[in-house]
Amino acid sequence: MAGNSIGQFFRVTTFGESHGIALGCIIDGVPPGIPITEADIQLDLDRRRPGTSRYTTQRRELDQVRILSGVFEGVTTGTSIGLMIENTDQRSQDYSAIKDVFRPGHADYTYEQKYGVRDYRGGGRSSARETAMRVAAGAIAKKYLAQKFGVQVRGYLAQMGDVSCDLLDWDLVEQNPFFCPDASKLEPLDALMRELKKAGDSIGAKITVVAENVPVGLGEPVFDRLDADLAHALMSINAVKGVEIGDGFAVVTKRGSENRDEITPQGFQSNHAGGILGGISSGQPVVAHIALKPTSSIMVPGQTINRQGEAVEMVTRGRHDPCVGIRAVPIAEAMMAIVLMDHLLRQRAQCGDVASDVPRW
C-alpha cells in the first residue's frame, strides 16, 4: 500500500487499522521552535472522536494522543514528530459474520480484489478510524498557521439530507453536536436523525471549510495548484464523493460577467473563485465544500455476494454513524490545514524573498 503519505515539505504519513492495537503517524517538515503539547492536539481530536453524542457511533474511544518524538521541553525540534493513539474499544466479534461476505457500498470487495486479503474487522485500513491521525497532524498545522500567519481554518455542516444550514454564527458551530451554524436548523436535524435511527438507515451531508487570512501566492502551477492539492486532500477523506472550490458546480449556469471576481483599489468585490486564481491563493478566504455519501453500514437488508460468488442478503451490524458528515468537519479542517502548511513552506523555500509592488488586501 503506497498511498499512506501526503505533502512534500510538510509530509504526513499515517498507519494503523480500525481494530488494530493503535493508530499512528509520522510528521516530517515541522519547523523547530513551535510550542506544542498533547493538550493542543487533543482539542481537535475530542471534536472528532466517536461516542460523544447520540447522533454518532457509540464506539467509545478516548483518542488520547501521545507524542513519541520531535518535541522537547514543549517545543518542536525540527525532527520527525511521531504520534500515537491506542485503540481501546474494539468489538471485533461484531464483524465475524462478514468475514466471507462483501458489504455493499464498502471497500471490502475492492480491497480483497487488490490485495488478496483484507482485515474485515471494522473495515481495517479503509475505516474512517484512520482519520484520527489526520486530525492530530492537522492540529499541529493549524497551530503553526495561526501563530505565524494568523490563518484560521474552520468548518461547518452546510447540509444534511434536505436540511440546509446557512452560515449565521461561527460560535454556534462548537455549541451543538452537528457543527451547525444555524440555530433554526437544529431541531430539523435532530428530527432527521431520529427518523434515520428508527428506519435503520443513513443520510449524506455537505461540509464547508473556510481558511481566512491565507497569504497571497500559495500554490505551485501547474500540477500542484493549490486547488488541485486541496481537492486531492479532501477527496481522500472516507466517504467523500465530490469536492468544490468556491462556487464549484454552480458556475455551470453563470455567465462570465457574473462569475468573475472584479477588483477595485479597495480589493476584490466577490469571492466566487474561493480564494484561488490560476491555482494560486489570492489573499481572499479559501473556501471548499465536500459531499459525503450516506454510510452503507445500515440495518436495511441489502444484496451482495460471498467469497464463493453466491448471492447473500445481509444487514450490517456493529456501531456506525447514521451520518458520517457530522464528524467529518474537524477532518476536513485538518486536511485543508495540512495542504496550506505544506504550500506555505514551499512558498517560503522558493519565493520567500520575492517582493511585489502590487497592492494586497
UniProtKB/Swiss-Prot annotation:
It is an enzyme of class 4 (lyase). The keyword Amino-acid biosynthesis applies. GO terms for molecular function: chorismate synthase activity; FMN binding. Reduced FMN (FMNH(2)). Signal peptide: none annotated. Pathway: Metabolic intermediate biosynthesis; chorismate biosynthesis; chorismate from D-erythrose 4-phosphate and phosphoenolpyruvate: step 7/7. InterPro entries: Chorismate_synth, Chorismate_synth_AroC_sf, Chorismate_synthase_CS. One of its GO terms (cellular component) is cytosol. GO terms for biological process: amino acid biosynthetic process; aromatic amino acid family biosynthetic process; chorismate biosynthetic process. Its cofactor is FMNH2. The keyword Kinase does not apply. NADP(+) binds at R48, R54. FMN binds at R125, S126, S127, N238, A239, G278, K293, P294, T295, S296, S297, R319. Its EC number is 4.2.3.5. Homotetramer. This reaction introduces a second double bond into the aromatic ring system. Belongs to the chorismate synthase family. This is Chorismate synthase. It comes from Yersinia pestis.
